[in-house]
Structures are given as C-alpha cells and as structure tokens.
Amino acid sequence: MGSAWKWTKMITVGAVVCVGGPMFVNYVRPTEEELFQRFNPELQKRNLANRDKRQQEFDEFVTKLKEYSKSDKPIWVVAKEAEELQKKQQREAALAAKKAAAETPTDKPTQ
C-alpha cells in the first residue's frame, strides 16, 4: 500500500509541475503590448519609428538564411563564405573608387 501511495503522489506532483509550471509562466509573463505600454513615451516613439527598419532587416536576414540553407554545406560555413565575399567586393569597390579619384584631374584655379 505504501508503494502505491508514493507512485500516486509522485505522478500527481509531476503532473502539477509539468502542467502548472508553463501555465504559471504564461500567467506571469507580460504580453508584447503590455511591455510596450510600460515604455516611457520617448521610447515608444523611437520604437515605432524604427519598427519598419527592424522588420525589413529581419526579413532580409530570413531571406539570407533561406538562401544559405539551399547549400549542402552547414549554414554557418555558407554565411562565413558570403561574408568574406561581401568584404572582398567592398574592398574592390573602395579600391576602384580610389583609382577613379586619382585619375580624375582636379581643376584648381591658379592665382
């Protein structure tokens, strides 16, 4: 009889913890709107002003991840390769701009 009581007690406690824990977390955790309302007005304005930019950056990030996932390589390897390629292109563009600036004659009036 003692063994059955222990099993029943442990199963009951386990169920309460497994079900009650997440329910308690959901009850205590504020919603996104409640958090936004707690911001001071200046932060609310700044958040609203930057919302479109952040959403666009997130969409670009997800698009890049989708492109990277098409490769057979792990995503972090493909992302690093893409980052290195982008840096190389930026260096080449900067070098080309430097050369173009050096080749362009500057017309300075002589006095």
Swiss-Prot record:
GO terms for cellular component: mitochondrial inner membrane. Keywords: Chaperone, Coiled coil, Membrane, Mitochondrion, Mitochondrion inner membrane, Transmembrane, Transmembrane helix. It comes from the Eukaryota. Residues 92-103 have a biased composition (Low complexity). The chain crosses the membrane at residues 10-28. It is a single-pass membrane protein. This is Assembly factor CBP4. The gene is CBP4.
